[in-house]
């Protein structure tokens, strides 16, 4: 195991209290009457939207009082075993913006979003008792940490409280696959062809109808700041390819711009390997990662675009990328914790190294390869890296430096604004040769730089020092 690889500033996160403020429901007489009636609660994790959201539809049509709950779990803001902060400033700020907008959207539906800091398994039980919760609706998660919290919660609350969980993060719902998860193809192309032929994408779910105003709790819930989470704020970089904010509203604005205003979608296949600017790719991944945008919303907007504007290779290719996202989720659903193992899902052994100096040189953009360095500096300064960049720096880390690929994956988890556990570890396994790449390729970084940064503009942008550095 590698000792602390990054600076000591973040060490204060270990001392972060599990609950900074203990919330107590402040009830008016009206609310007291309300709580006598059975209530339901939507427990939010990576499904941070109101539209096309199964849990909210189920809850608001139940006939009961409805509340929502989100907790900033301190485990997500401490340090990993590799020494990296689990969540750095870029993604944390994006999440704060997402929760802020979600709270406002729910207020418009007369639903209170309870926001806390702490382990949900410790915070939720008191609300279940005080609000007379009889059913908890939530999105199914299957990776280790999420399952542990769910198991703790089930132990902590009365057995008569019902759990209603749903898969709501896929393009192709698991129930609509033409095979069992255990029979999932180990090669993406096989998965894609079978699903395209035999599966279908479900229609978007209806919007929620506002509830009576009596449903609202009088208490206001404060959303934590970066400082509350023990994270130092970072200034937005003027050259960032991801200058966007969190939340479903911003996601919809981006979708409308990329599709209808600029019609960039028509050229997506030609531009998707770009490196500079906000429009070479869709940039939907960050909203997809925390569930403030659903893949179905994107898919059906593509279908509308194909009917009204043009249907071509580019419109298909964005669906193709959504299928890759689905595939890595299904790979983790099939293989569970093996996606975190050094040997990966192939149980393939390599001679990996844990050279701290090499790891830090990679992180700081001080390797022998300028193209790798430029991408790593971009990541450190903006929380973003292009898909082409990610493939190259990961291949260099695992195949050239021969470093334990899980360290690189953990650093991406820390830094990326669009971190998604399934895509991150699925892609890292793929590149490292322990995942779903049947050819076990190694990127020639210099040839890649010549092809995708022929004039060297991207490398100059990030490798040249400024007056303030």
Where do the PLM segments sit?
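Alpha-helical packing segments of well-folded alpha/beta enzyme cores
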Residues: 55, 98, 102, 251-254, ...
């Amino acid at each position: 195991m590698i000792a602390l690889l990054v600076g000591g500033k973040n060490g204060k996160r270990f001392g972060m209290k599990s609950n900074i403020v203990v919330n107590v429901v402040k009830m008016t007489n009206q609310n007291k009457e309300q709580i006598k009636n059975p209530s339901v609660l939507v427990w939010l994790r990576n499904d941070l939207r109101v539209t096309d959201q199964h849990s909210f539809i189920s809850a608001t049509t139940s006939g009961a009082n409805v509340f929502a709950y989100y907790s900033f779990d301190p485990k997500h803001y401490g340090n990993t075993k590799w020494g990296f902060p689990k969540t750095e400033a870029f993604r944390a700020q994006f999440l704060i913006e997402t929760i802020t907008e979600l709270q406002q959207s729910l207020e418009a539906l007369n639903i209170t979003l309870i926001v806390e800091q702490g382990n949900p398994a410790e915070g939720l039980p008191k609300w279940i008792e005080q609000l007379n919760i009889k059913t908890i609706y939530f999105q199914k998660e299957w990776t280790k940490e999420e399952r542990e919290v769910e198991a703790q919660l089930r132990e902590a609350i009365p057995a008569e409280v019902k759990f209603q969980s749903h898969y709501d993060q896929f393009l192709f719902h698991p129930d609509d696959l033409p095979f069992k998860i255990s029979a999932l193809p180990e090669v993406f192309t096989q998965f894609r062809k079978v699903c395209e032929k035999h599966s279908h994408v479900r229609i978007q779910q209806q919007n929620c109808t506002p509830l009576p105003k009596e449903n609202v709790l009088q208490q206001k819930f404060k959303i934590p700041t970066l400082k509350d989470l023990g994270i130092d704020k970072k200034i937005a970089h003027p050259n960032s390819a991801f200058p966007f904010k969190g939340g479903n509203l911003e996601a919809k604005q981006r979708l409308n711009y990329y599709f209808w205003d600029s019609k960039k979608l028509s050229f997506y296949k030609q531009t998707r390997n770009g490196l500079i600017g906000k429009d070479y790719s869709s940039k939907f991944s960050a909203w997809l990662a925390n569930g403030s945008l659903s893949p179905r919303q994107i898919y059906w907007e593509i279908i509308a675009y194909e009917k009204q504007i043009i249907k071509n290779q580019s419109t298909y290719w964005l669906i193709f990328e959504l299928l890759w996202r689905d595939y890595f989720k299904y790979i983790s659903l099939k293989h569970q914790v093996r996606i975190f193992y050094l040997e990966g899902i192939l149980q393939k052994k390599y001679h990996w190294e844990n050279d701290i100096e090499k790891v830090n040189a990679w992180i700081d953009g001080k390797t022998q390869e300028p193209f790798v360095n430029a991408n790593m500096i971009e990541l450190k300064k903006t929380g973003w890296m292009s898909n082409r960049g990610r493939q190259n720096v990961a291949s260099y880390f695992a195949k050239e430096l021969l470093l334990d690929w899980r360290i690189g994956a953990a650093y991406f988890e820390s830094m990326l604004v669009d971190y998604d556990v399934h895509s991150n570890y699925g892609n890292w396994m793929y590149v490292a040769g322990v995942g779903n790449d049947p050819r076990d390729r190694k990127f020639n970084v210099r040839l890649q730089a010549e092809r995708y940064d022929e004039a060297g503009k991207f490398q100059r942008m990030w490798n040249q020092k400024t007056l303030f550095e």
